[in-house]
Amino acid sequence: MKVTLIAILICAAVLVLHTTAAEELEAESQLMEVGMPDTELAAVDEERLFECSVSCEIEKEGNKDCKKKKCKGGWKCKFNMCVKV
């Protein structure tokens, strides 16, 4: 009877440790996935900077100043370029 009780307690302890380890592994994998959008956002920021620069250059050649309203979403016009605020 004591052996059965000890075996059940050991199995329960192993199950708890295994579940805790699995939760930690899942949390780590989610943290790694969170970093991915940052690289995607960096690419979008670079693309946006390029688009705004080209837009301002086209307007500049057409004897117009860079329009501040063209720069939106955390961007502002500075030195005839849209820059991230």
From Swiss-Prot:
Gene Ontology CC, one term: extracellular region
Keywords: Disulfide bond, Neurotoxin, Postsynaptic neurotoxin, Secreted, Signal, Toxin
Disulfide bonds: 52-66, 56-77, 71-82
Location within or outside the cell: Secreted
GO molecular-function term, one example from the UniProt record: toxin activity
Pfam families: Toxin_20
Major subcellular location class: secreted
Family per similarity comment: Belongs to the neurotoxin 12 (Hwtx-2) family. 02 (Hwtx-2) subfamily.
Name of the protein: U4-theraphotoxin-Hhn1a
Organism encoding this protein: Cyriopagopus hainanus
